[in-house]
Amino acid sequence: MRKIIIIGLCVIACAPSPPTQSPPRVQTVAAAPPVNTEETAVAPDAVADSLLADVRSYDSTIVVDLRYATSNNFTGAPLPGYGANHAYLRREAASALARVQKDLNPRGLGLKIFDGYRPVRATLAMVDWTERVHRPDLLTDGYIASRSRHNLGLAVDLTLIELPSRRELEMGTPFDTFSAAAHTANASGLAATNRQKLKSAMEAEGFVNYDQEWWHYTFSVPNPLRFDRPIR
């Protein structure tokens, strides 16, 4: 009996221990870089250079009067980032706008651009101006935006002109009128007719009107990016 116990203990004691298992290897996965959309950071200037195009490189007959490059705008001074009278848009939007111009020309009409791509710094300057002149209502009422589709190169402010005189058609209010009179539907007579002409021509090529501003149209592309590249 004693021998059996000893043997039993020996069996237990001498039994080989199970091999030590290494802890499972944890694979580390690099975090994906943040997608740069209109809600995140500004894209590098090199990216802007590859995606933005001068509208007149698609159709040189489009007239450009970039108001924010001059003192002829609601702030009374040129805005930061506007160093030249060149209207830029995303290439897709610039191409579509050239088609609008081509559609209008047989009717003796053309486009005149007041603003296209807008550097982020210019938008921030507009917001700062509203604070200096105590006009927060312009932000809350939707006339000035702290984040604008102009920063994406996907918005354009424009009107119709007669050709070859380049005379602007009657639209009821000047560009950048901050009142209900500028709402696209708030016009009658000749102004209403001309606003509808512009709207129909722009919508035919994929642009969408902002109903509080008869002059403001937007275009859509997948994964839009914000830019701050100066206009030069």
For every predicted segment, state its role:
Residues P119:
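Segments that shape or occlude catalytic/ligand-binding pockets
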Residues A122:
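Short, well-ordered surface patches within globular domains
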Residues R2-I7:
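Sec-dependent signal peptide recognition
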Residues L9-A15:
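Hydrophobic h-region of N-terminal signal peptides that target proteins for export
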Residues A125:
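Thiolate-centered catalytic microenvironments shared by cysteine-dependent enzyme domains
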Residues A15-G116, D128-Q212, V221-R232:
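Extracytoplasmic cell-surface/polysaccharide-interacting catalytic and binding patches
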Residues Y217:
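Conserved metal-phosphate-binding beta-hairpin within the catalytic cores
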